[in-house]
Amino acid sequence: MRVYEFARNYGMTSKELVAICHEIGIEVKAQSKLDETQLATLSRHICRGKDTNETIETTPKVVKKSREAKTIAYVVTECEPFTSLGELGKTAAAFATQTIKDGRSLIIALPKYKEITEVYGTTMEWLMDLPIKVGSTEARASLFKLVQDSVTYLFIGNDRYFTREEIYGYEDDAERFAFFNRAVLEALPYLGTKISEIYVNDWHTSMIPLILNVDYKYHSFYQKVKTTLNIHNLEYQGWYSVDILPNVLGISRQYYDNGLTRMGDSVNLLKSGIETATRIQLNEISTEQLKLPQMHES
């Protein structure tokens, strides 16, 4: 049994259990495997203060999940503690904490940025490589998994797109995140968990509802899967020329001609998510931004 599994069974976080281990002289990390002696020592320490005649079980009981419980996929470009430039990363972490507290299973999908690889690379489990469509070509996505504090983190790796000094601000951002969006949809069926809902965040992942409707509509894994678009900041909407649809997203220009992705004379990727997601959620910042005159002009 690993540290994070023991922590989950005893209702605590990996960080809390690691601290306890260090207090009693057991040097471990969240991914470390506990031997029988360490398990017994930890169990005695945690159960200290209870009736001394009580039988202490060194193997915690497995808590059966309710049949009603469904797994949520949360697709985002920032999430603490891995990477965060502001509120988006904090919001993702808070969502994870609340979802687990509510007794639901959660998968968070993130790009495997350079800074994440440098800190967490050795603790991740490589799953497989998959070919991902980018326009009329393909790029390879390397899938990695890390379970921490009862959350399954899915990292999408590609050296060309994500081994860079910054997260955003590149001319090919649309291509980078279109690759990430499609890679997530390709990867989820391989995790062996049925998904009930996919949450996406801002324009960087708002392509998922669109791609899902265009290319995965009849995929058995995605039948009855709902999508929620969280809008955190309307200042960034993903404005691009129409060529982005066939050349990057790999979908027909007809989705511009019919108005689904079009705003003015450009493709607006945030709009594509608004038009195709099952539901939309706005935070306080984006709600206030809607009141600004320039938002009505666009």
Question: Can you describe what each PLM-predicted range is?
Answer:
Residues 64-298:
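Catalytic cores of nucleotide-sugar-dependent glycosyltransferases that transfer UDP/GDP/TDP-activated
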Residues 1-64:
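Charge-dense, low-complexity intrinsically disordered segments
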